[in-house]
């Protein structure tokens, strides 16, 4: 009986982890030799919407000002720290970010708790990387 309960628990946990996967879709691919790595300071343009109703909650395009941050340092949500690795300058991706990789159950501002987020992203630059390194 214990084995049966334990097996059921493992299957349930496996299902939960599958449901919480980060979605990464390359929408505009670019060839390069220098891709983003943890620790890079990057400039990203983005538009963020809620998966539930498509409402936009933020856009760097509207401000005409890309967001600058260090990848993998926790300055942004986990979905960005993981979903923006191995990108080339000029590449575009759509990230589908479950709550576990976003703002969790607490939400923030116009983003409700438990929200799955959709980000259309574009890598504009990597600090210290010149055009001839690409």
UniProtKB/Swiss-Prot annotation:
It catalyses: [protein]-peptidylproline (omega=180) = [protein]-peptidylproline (omega=0). Residues 1-19 form the signal peptide. It is found in: Endoplasmic reticulum. InterPro entries: FKBP2/11, PPIase_dom_sf, PPIase_FKBP_dom. A motif (Prevents secretion from ER) lies at residues 131-134. Its EC number is 5.2.1.8. Transmembrane segments: none annotated. Keywords: Endoplasmic reticulum, Isomerase, Rotamase, Signal. Its main location: endoplasmic reticulum. GO terms for biological process: chaperone-mediated protein folding. Residues 39-127 form the PPIase FKBP-type domain. GO terms for molecular function: peptidyl-prolyl cis-trans isomerase activity. The keyword Endoplasmic reticulum applies. It is an enzyme of class 5 (isomerase). GO terms for cellular component: endoplasmic reticulum. It comes from the Eukaryota. Inhibited by both FK506 and rapamycin. PPIases accelerate the folding of proteins. It catalyzes the cis-trans isomerization of proline imidic peptide bonds in oligopeptides. Belongs to the FKBP-type PPIase family. FKBP2 subfamily. This is FK506-binding protein 2.
């Amino acid at each position: 009986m214990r084995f049966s309960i334990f097996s059921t628990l493992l299957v349930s946990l496996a299902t939960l982890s599958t449901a919480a996967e980060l979605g990464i879709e390359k929408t505009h691919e670019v060839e390069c030799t220098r891709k983003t790595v943890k620790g890079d300071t990057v400039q990203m343009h983005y538009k963020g919407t809620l998966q539930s109703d498509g409402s936009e909650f933020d856009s760097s395009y509207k401000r005409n000002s890309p967001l600058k941050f260090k990848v993998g340092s926790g300055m942004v949500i986990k979905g960005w720290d993981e979903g923006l690795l191995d990108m080339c300058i000029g590449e575009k991706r759509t990230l589908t970010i479950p709550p576990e990789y976003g703002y969790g159950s607490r939400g923030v501002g116009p983003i409700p708790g438990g929200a799955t987020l959709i980000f259309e992203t574009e890598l504009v630059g990597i600090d210290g990387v010149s055009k001839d390194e690409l």
